[in-house]
A protein has these predicted regions:
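Terminal low-complexity tails and localization/encapsulation signals of metabolic enzymes
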Residues: 2, 248-261
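C-terminal long alpha-helix characteristic of the crotonase
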Residues: 21, 127-132, 183-228, 239-241, ...
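Glycine- (often His-adjacent) and acidic-residue-rich active-site loop
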Residues: 58-93, 142
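CoA-thioester-processing core
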Residues: 93-99, 107, 113-166, 180, ...
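Well-ordered beta-strand positions
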Residues: 125, 164, 168-170, 176, ...
Length: 261
C-alpha cells in the first residue's frame, strides 16, 4: 500500500503528516511528489488565508525511516532514472519546503533517517523525542548521498559529524543531535506533540510578515545575497498594518494583534 501526505488545518496552524505506517513512514515516490505539491500549495496561498505555522510530523510515533527500499530496483540501477529520481523528484520536493515562507516545525519521533532527515533539515525549528534517532546509513546499501541532499545536510550538521555519520553509517541519538545543533530541543517522547504545538502556537501570535521576510532574507544570505535590489525591497514593510500594530501595541502596553490583509 502506498504512503500519503496529509495536510490538515486547525485555526492558524497547519499540519503535514508523512504517512506510510506499515514501513515506519518510508517515503515512496508518490509521497515525494505529494510533498512538493503540498508545500507549493501552502506557499501559494493568499497571505490572508495562509497558516501562520506548519507542523511536519510522521504518523504512528515515527517521523520517517528513509526511502521506500521496495521501490529501489525500479530506478536505482539505471543512471538516467537514478539522476531523475534525485534531481527531478526529491530535489524539487525539498526545495518546496525550503522556499516556504511559513515557519515550519518538525515534530520528530522515532526514526528520522535518510529522506526523513532531509525533510527535517528543511524545517526551521526541530524538536525531538528522547528516543528518536537520526542518520543516513546508506553506505550499508552501497550508495552515496546525492550532492544536493548532502549540501542540505551540511547546513544542518557540523562537517566532522556529517562525515562520521556517512562514512561509518552511524546514527545519532537525540542527545547527540541536540549537542551538535541538529535539533533545537529534546523532550520526553510523550511530550513531543504538545511541546511542538505550544511553540507553533506561540509563533502564530507573532507577526507573519516578519516571519515571511526573515525567511526570505535568510534564503538570500544562503545564496550569497541579498543584492542591492533585494536590500532596497526589504524595507517595503515600512507602512504596513503589522508594522504599525506592533509598534502601537508596545507603546500602549498591550499584546499585539496581527491581522493579515
Amino acid at each position: 500500500m502506498a504512503g500519503s501526505i496529509a495536510l490538515t488545518r486547525r485555526g492558524p496552524l497547519a499540519r503535514v503528516t508523512l504517512a506510510n505506517p506499515a514501513k515506519h513512514n518510508a517515503i515512496d515516490v508518490a509521497m515525494w511528489h505529494d510533498l512538493r505539491a503540498t508545500f507549493e500549495r501552502l506557499q501559494g496561498a493568499p497571505e490572508t488565508a495562509a497558516p501562520r505555522a506548519v507542523i511536519v510530523c510522521g504518523e504512528g510515533g515515527q517521523f520517517a525511516s528513509g526511502g521506500d527500499i521496495a521501490e529501489f530496483a525500479g530506478f536505482r540501477f539505471d543512471e538516467a532514472r537514478l539522476h531523475d529520481f534525485h534531481e527531478r523528484i526529491v530535489a524539487p520536493a525539498l526545495e518546496a519546503l525550503l522556499a516556504c515562507d511559513i515557519p515550519l516545525l518538525a515534530q520528530i519521533e522515532g526514526a528520522c533517517i535518510g529522506g526523513g532527515l532531509e525533510i527535517a533539515a528543511c524545517c526551521d525549528i526541530r524538536i525531538a523525542g528522547s528516543s528518536s534517532r537520526f542518520g543516513a546509513p546508506i553506505a550499508r546499501l552501497g550508495f552515496p548521498m546525492a550532492p544536493g541532499e548532502l549540501q542540505l545536510l551540511s547546513q544542518a550538521l557540523p562537517a566532522p559529524v556529517l562525515r562520521e555519520m556517512l562514512l561509518e553509517a552511524r546514527l545519532l541519538d537525540a542527545a547527540g543531535a541536540l549537542r551538535h545543533g541538529l535539533v533545537h530541543g529534546v523532550v520526553a517522547d510523550t511530550e513531543v506533540a504538545t511541546h511542538v504545538l505550544q511553540r507553533a502556537g506561540h509563533i502564530a501570535t507573532l507577526s507573519p510578515q516578519a516571519a515571511r521576510i526573515n525567511k526570505r532574507t535568510l534564503r538570500q544570505i544562503a545564496a550569497g545575497g541579498p543584492n542591492a535590489a533585494e536590500r532596497r525591497a526589504h524595507f517595503g514593510y515600512a507602512d504596513s498594518a503589522e508594522h504599525r500594530e506592533g509598534i502601537a501595541a508596545f507603546l500602549e502596553k498591550r499584546p499585539p494583534h496581527f491581522q493579515r490583509g
